């Protein structure tokens, strides 16, 4: 019996050291050396203060800001601990109510509703934490944001274009706009104006 226990203990200790200590230490060192910004949460700073992460959406509801996708985390929007699949099915009456409420909020904020509303402005993402919207959703909001900030529409459109990221490697994903980065660029442009 003793001859069976010793190898089990040795294997347990070795595997614990390799998978619990060595492997995480090597990956952490690699991440810090090769991708330090990403390994530390892709934090965005302004005037030396962290204002958010490029990977987690934030709640913007003032008309002078671009709005991101709906957060599906409740009761606190963009709560990373509450992330998860949350979109309602297409036949669920609650989805229609949420979409109508979001369209009403867009209308109340002064958005021109004569054009079709991009779907990512009225539905939540699967995680409920998306930091990005489509260029169409950003373009849809340009007039409202420009009016609220008393900036030229062309100035706001240029900021949207400057903050639009294309497909990764030219083929993966879709073009997108990081809402936090765009809103920070808007604040900086208005301060300089």
UniProtKB/Swiss-Prot annotation:
The keyword Iron is assigned to this record: no
Name of one Pfam family that matches? KdpC
What gene, per UniProt, encodes this protein? kdpC
Q: Where in the cell is it found?
A: Cell inner membrane
Q: How does it sit in the membrane?
A: Single-pass membrane protein
Q: Which protein are we looking at? A: Potassium-transporting ATPase KdpC subunit
Q: Which InterPro entries match?
A: KdpC
On assembly, the entry states: The system is composed of three essential subunits: KdpA, KdpB and KdpC.
Say which domain of life the source belongs to. Bacteria
Recorded GO molecular functions are: ATP binding; P-type potassium transmembrane transporter activity
